[in-house]
């Protein structure tokens, strides 16, 4: 950005993607203001770095700014966007600002319907281990930084590429990772064909000397490869992948061999459970080795990984009950998390507390949601977290509970509010249980609420 840009206003600044960009911009000494609907811990953290943030959206929040950056959740009739248009202030999506930051570095973009945040975090851990001090922008709290962004002094920028509204096509990285391609965000794309088209364009956006590192085990990815005109490296468990993992041990630690073509590179001990996390680690190894990082540094970076918030995160234990929190909100993500829970907590009763996220997603995947909880011992269901969407007639937490009862033998209880669920927990949980909270909304409050003995979330 040139010297004309001094003051940047960010609408929806507390969101997972926006807050990381805001933190990097603050560290680059830009003047940052913004607004959000809630006074969250993220908002308070940004204020501590110097941002001026209003709670609630209003025209008067837009001061003497040169550009307004908007979150994907912000509608065109937002009063701050209306005010900016009146004053001919440039309005750009968050991905365009991320692209501007990436223009100053060698970009590595991590895309895919599931697994982006963890894969981005694992990649950052390896680059840190190699002494490359990357700039990192992710959609979750990376424990080693205590934040979801880090301004490094090295030449690389590692970023989570959000496909939800197609704006990830603004990015021009030298390396792309695609973890999977699934049917999601139909509120924007409308059809699976449109999703596929966006990912093909994303992969073809790398330069001729760049590389796409893609999961060769994912049918959605494989379907697109004939249309990709740029170099590709596949990874996965299947033997026809160029970069391959052979699992050796599962549990709270995943130990596996790594092969590149016919050469055994060595072994990795990853302090994260689940086959999906082995795949995420393989992708990060592929990205790291492409820029010249040795396998030994890759293995060390993965072994020392400190985790990322809300990704199978152990929150604590009380009265013999273990509490785990996970961001999973799509049926495929939930299935992977539940399989991991069964693997890690073999023989224990799994009590899943799920808060559906968005009316459109619940409607689009209603049948899958009804079946995905078949292997939990008890399901506690709350009302849908709207995430700024308007309700859809006939789509609710209660209708989902009814649908699950029709096709599954899993006991399910519905709670209108999170507080109702919090008050019921002491009568539901038993010694030896695992309470697994699932969803992208405020369900994350439930575990700490119970651990602290509170009756409201």
UniProtKB/Swiss-Prot annotation:
<comment type="similarity">
    <text>Belongs to the MurCDEF family.</text>
</comment>
<protein>
    <recommendedName>
        <fullName>UDP-N-acetylmuramate--L-alanine ligase</fullName>
        <ecNumber>6.3.2.8</ecNumber>
    </recommendedName>
</protein>
<dbReference type="GO" id="GO:0008360">
    <property type="term" value="P:regulation of cell shape"/>
</dbReference>
<keyword id="KW-0131">Cell cycle</keyword>
<dbReference type="InterPro" id="IPR004101">
    <property type="entry name" value="Mur_ligase_C"/>
</dbReference>
<dbReference type="Pfam" id="PF08245">
    <property type="entry name" value="Mur_ligase_M"/>
</dbReference>
<keyword id="KW-0067">ATP-binding</keyword>
<dbReference type="Pfam" id="PF01225">
    <property type="entry name" value="Mur_ligase"/>
</dbReference>
<dbReference type="GO" id="GO:0008763">
    <property type="term" value="F:UDP-N-acetylmuramate-L-alanine ligase activity"/>
</dbReference>
<dbReference type="InterPro" id="IPR036615">
    <property type="entry name" value="Mur_ligase_C_dom_sf"/>
</dbReference>
<dbReference type="GO" id="GO:0009252">
    <property type="term" value="P:peptidoglycan biosynthetic process"/>
</dbReference>
<dbReference type="GO" id="GO:0005737">
    <property type="term" value="C:cytoplasm"/>
</dbReference>
<keyword id="KW-0573">Peptidoglycan synthesis</keyword>
<keyword id="KW-0436">Ligase</keyword>
<dbReference type="Pfam" id="PF02875">
    <property type="entry name" value="Mur_ligase_C"/>
</dbReference>
<dbReference type="InterPro" id="IPR013221">
    <property type="entry name" value="Mur_ligase_cen"/>
</dbReference>
<keyword id="KW-0547">Nucleotide-binding</keyword>
<keyword id="KW-0133">Cell shape</keyword>
<dbReference type="InterPro" id="IPR000713">
    <property type="entry name" value="Mur_ligase_N"/>
</dbReference>
<comment type="function">
    <text>Cell wall formation.</text>
</comment>
<feature type="binding site">
    <location>
        <begin position="112"/>
        <end position="118"/>
    </location>
    <ligand>
        <name>ATP</name>
    </ligand>
</feature>
<dbReference type="InterPro" id="IPR036565">
    <property type="entry name" value="Mur-like_cat_sf"/>
</dbReference>
<keyword id="KW-0963">Cytoplasm</keyword>
<dbReference type="GO" id="GO:0071555">
    <property type="term" value="P:cell wall organization"/>
</dbReference>
<dbReference type="InterPro" id="IPR050061">
    <property type="entry name" value="MurCDEF_pg_biosynth"/>
</dbReference>
<dbReference type="GO" id="GO:0005524">
    <property type="term" value="F:ATP binding"/>
</dbReference>
<keyword id="KW-0132">Cell division</keyword>
<keyword id="KW-0961">Cell wall biogenesis/degradation</keyword>
<dbReference type="GO" id="GO:0051301">
    <property type="term" value="P:cell division"/>
</dbReference>
<dbReference type="InterPro" id="IPR005758">
    <property type="entry name" value="UDP-N-AcMur_Ala_ligase_MurC"/>
</dbReference>
<comment type="pathway">
    <text>Cell wall biogenesis; peptidoglycan biosynthesis.</text>
</comment>
């Amino acid at each position: 950005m040139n010297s004309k840009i001094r003051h940047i206003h960010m609408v929806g600044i507390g969101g997972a993607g926006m807050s990381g960009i805001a933190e990097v911009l603050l560290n680059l000494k830009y003047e940052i203001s913004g607004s959000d609907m809630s006074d969250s811990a993220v908002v308070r953290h940004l204020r501590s770095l110097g941002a001026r943030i209003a709670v609630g959206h209003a025209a008067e929040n837009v001061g003497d700014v040169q550009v307004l950056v908007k979150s994907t959740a912000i509608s065109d009739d937002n009063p701050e966007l209306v005010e900016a248009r009146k004053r001919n202030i440039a309005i750009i999506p968050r991905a365009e600002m991320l692209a501007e930051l990436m223009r100053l570095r060698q970009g590595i973009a991590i895309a895919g319907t599931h697994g982006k945040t963890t894969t981005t975090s694992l990649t950052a851990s390896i680059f840190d281990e190699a002494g490359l001090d990357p700039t990192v922008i992710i959609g979750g709290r990376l424990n080693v930084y205590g934040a979801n962004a880090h301004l490094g002094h090295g030449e690389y920028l590692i970023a989570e590429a959000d496909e939800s509204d197609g704006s990830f096509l603004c990015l021009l990285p030298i390396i792309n990772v695609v973890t999977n391609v699934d049917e999601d965000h139909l509120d924007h794309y409308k059809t699976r064909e449109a999703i596929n088209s966006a990912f093909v364009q994303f992969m073809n956006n790398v330069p001729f000397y760049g590389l796409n590192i893609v999961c060769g085990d994912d049918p959605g990815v494989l379907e697109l490869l004939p249309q990709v005109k740029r170099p590709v490296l596949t990874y996965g468990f299947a033997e026809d992948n160029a970069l391959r993992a052979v699992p050796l041990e599962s549990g709270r630690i995943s130990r596996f061999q790594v092969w590149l073509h016919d050469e055994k590179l060595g072994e990795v001990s990853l302090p994260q459970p689940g086959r999906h996390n082995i795949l995420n680690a393989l992708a990060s190894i592929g990205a790291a080795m492409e820029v010249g990082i040795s396998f030994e540094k890759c293995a060390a970076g993965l072994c020392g990984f400190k985790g990322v918030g809300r990704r199978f995160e152990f929150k604590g234990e009380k009265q013999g009950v273990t509490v785990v929190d996970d961001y999973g909100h799509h049926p495929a993500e939930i299935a992977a998390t539940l399989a991991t829970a069964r693997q890690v907590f073999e023989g224990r009763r799994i009590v899943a507390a799920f808060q559906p996220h968005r009316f459109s997603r619940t409607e689009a995947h209603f049948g899958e949601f009804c079946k995905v909880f078949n292997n939990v011992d008890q399901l506690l269901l709350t009302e849908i977290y709207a995430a700024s969407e308007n309700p859809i007639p006939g789509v609710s937490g209660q209708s989902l509970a009814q649908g699950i009862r029709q096709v599954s033998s899993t006991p399910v209880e519905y709670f209108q509010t999170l507080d109702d669920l919090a008050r019921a927990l002491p009568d539901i949980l038993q010694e030896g249980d695992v309470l697994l909270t699932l969803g992208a909304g405020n369900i994350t409050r439930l575990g700490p609420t119970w651990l602290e003995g509170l009756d409201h979330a």
